[in-house]
């Protein structure tokens, strides 16, 4: 579902990256020391095997994204990093009562303003959507965007879009959701 939505949105971007290797191997959105960097299937591998996974999948993706962002910021331009994810509708017996989450760092005023505008644009597209800020996760929690915010303190906005997987069937996001996100992002950009 997230890749399907990403493909819908990439025409709006000056550049785009996606990672097809799933988190069952390695979670590229986590910092290198995070306890959930490796999954239940890979956490017991040898150090050598883990390093091979990091070398083959983790570092190339993260380094490519970071290098592209750096080259744009060095030119004096601003980067909006819009990261697309999905979340499970039910976690540990808790029903998550939202359709879309917008994750940002509340201490960064430009991210906060962008998120407010984007949320309003989404509501204009589909008033029925339940949209929450920093849910189902905190926007400043451990993650790739959090790392990038620390590295690029100026001219970088990191926003994570979390869409409920109830809108996904056979890896395809419902068209009405894709279209609402596309139009809302186009309008705010």
Task: Report each predicted region and the residues it spans.
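N-terminal catalytic or cofactor-binding beta/alpha core of small enzyme domains
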Residues: 1-189
């Amino acid at each position: 579902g997230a890749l399907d939505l990403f493909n819908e949105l990439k025409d709006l971007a000056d550049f785009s990256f996606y990672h097809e290797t799933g988190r069952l191997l390695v979670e590229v959105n986590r910092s290198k020391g995070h306890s959930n960097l490796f999954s239940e299937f890979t956490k017991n591998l040898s150090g050598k095997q883990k390093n091979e996974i990091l070398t083959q999948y983790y570092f190339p993706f993260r380094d490519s994204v970071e290098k592209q962002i750096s080259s744009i910021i060095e030119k004096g331009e601003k980067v909006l990093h819009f990261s697309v994810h999905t979340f499970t509708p039910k976690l540990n017996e808790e029903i998550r009562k939202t359709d879309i989450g917008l994750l940002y760092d509340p201490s960064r005023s430009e991210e906060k303003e962008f998120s407010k505008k984007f949320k309003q644009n989404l509501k204009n597209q589909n008033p029925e959507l339940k949209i929450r800020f920093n849910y189902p996760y905190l926007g400043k929690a451990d993650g790739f965007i959090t790392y990038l915010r620390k590295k690029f303190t100026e001219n970088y906005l990191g926003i994570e879009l979390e869409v409920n997987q109830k809108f996904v069937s056979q890896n395809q996001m419902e068209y009405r959701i894709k279209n609402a996100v596309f139009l809302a992002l186009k309008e705010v950009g």
